[in-house]
Amino acid sequence: MNKYLVPDSGLTSLSAAELAEKIHSREVTSREVTQAHLDRINDVDGTLHAFLHVGVEEALAAADAVDESLDKGEAPASALAGVPLALKDVFVTTDAPTTCASKMLEGYVAPYDATVTKKIREAGIPILGKTNMDEFAMGSSTENSAYGPTLNPWDIERTPGGSGGGTSAALASGEAPLGIGTDTGGSIRQPAALTNTVGVKPTYGTVSRYGLVACASSLDQGGPTARTVLDTALLHEVIAGHDKYDATSVNRAVAPVVAAAREGARGDLKGTKIGVVKQFDREGYQPGVLEQFHKSVEQLTAQGAEIVEVDCPHFDDALAAYYLILPCEVSSNLARFDGMRYGLREGDDGTHSAEEVMSLSRAAGFGPEVKRRIILGTYALSVGYYDAYYLQAQRVRTLIAQDFAVAYDKCDVLVSPTTPTTAFKLGEKVSDPLAMYNFDLCTLPLNLAGLCGMSLPSGLAPDSQLPTGLQIMAPAFQDDRLYKVGAAFEVGQK
């Protein structure tokens, strides 16, 4: 038995929906559930390092408030009231540091809560703490954290993925039943695949980015993670919705994701057309990953789905376009971290000019990958290169969105492997940025188009006995399709 994976029994072994039912029926208290997860964190996180900050008193106080309300006979604040959660350390919180895993923000406590944080609190969900990540969400392994890497509970010599590896590791180890992450090019879906959990990137604009420390504003999207499709849907409904404080927030009804998950749990996919993306089913991927993907497609067929092959030719250019657009936005967004207003300040001894203080602060505060992307973005946006690089990448982005539109004329959802390989060893790709970037091949086209996607467990790869993920992709604002197909697939896996 792997002691770092979810225990076989006890409160930390249960799904969020099961825990909510027990709490709301008063079979157990929210304090008991929250304490059980805090104890689990205490037991295993010294090794896994999924959390950067654990708020014991704050979590228990929130749990006590839920218990007090339920004991008075009041209705639960939400379907998940009382069930604790792990929050990626990129959402600002007034009662805990928000570091984005960077020395630049070490010890920084925000004066306000992110909208997602606020919605979680209003739903009666205790926040266990803030989880580890790649610095400013830049990376695919959680090795770029200034505070050390997170280890994969399935094999502690391997990465849990990134940038949100801390949240996924917390779920996979039973440290938390629910999690919130962000997805810029796969940072929710990719760690979910490597840790055998469920992660969803909602349609861009449907979950508020107010209070989310920006990496690349046109790509970033907060989203839910959990160990089951239903749990993920329940959390999705909590955090989604229009927000007047976010200029990119879309004012439209939230997709009926919970109803879709319950419908999909019947396991019947008759009448559903599922597209297999030709560009994501090819040689070069780990054989065990492709084998599990082909088994997944066979299972979907057995459940009644009609499978069609779709061609998305511009997906081959997605990686290059993404790694031009993202650094350009990073270069702009991270200009605010200058050592003058908040965060790390170096050289503030009266002997340095303001410009020198800024330079010293940024040199000391940012890690190598963040510096690399700032330099790339600044170069691509400079005079003489803007048209040749940035505008060209934006044109490719438009073509990728058109590829998706053509594909969805033929099918309801698309499927692919979530990652080209299973979890890789710690340190294996750190010195080779291109190899690390290639790990996002399957996930980043979705972000460029602003659509929605899910990764869910698709079995262990025969050649490595490590988790693989099936990625499901749906059109904008059709997030419920993810949950219907995902829940059906999940049932078929059992």
From Swiss-Prot:
Keywords: ATP-binding, Ligase, Nucleotide-binding, Protein biosynthesis. It comes from the Bacteria. The keyword Nucleotide-binding applies. GO terms for biological process: translation. Coiled coil: none annotated. The active site is at K88 (charge relay system), S163 (charge relay system), S187 (acyl-ester intermediate). It catalyses: L-glutamyl-tRNA(Gln) + L-glutamine + ATP + H2O = L-glutaminyl-tRNA(Gln) + L-glutamate + ADP + phosphate + H(+). Its EC number is 6.3.5.7. GO terms for cellular component: glutamyl-tRNA(Gln) amidotransferase complex. GO terms for molecular function: ATP binding; glutaminyl-tRNA synthase (glutamine-hydrolyzing) activity. Heterotrimer of A, B and C subunits. Allows the formation of correctly charged Gln-tRNA(Gln) through the transamidation of misacylated Glu-tRNA(Gln) in organisms which lack glutaminyl-tRNA synthetase. The reaction takes place in the presence of glutamine and ATP through an activated gamma-phospho-Glu-tRNA(Gln). Belongs to the amidase family. GatA subfamily. This is Glutamyl-tRNA(Gln) amidotransferase subunit A. It comes from Corynebacterium diphtheriae (strain ATCC 700971 / NCTC 13129 / Biotype gravis).
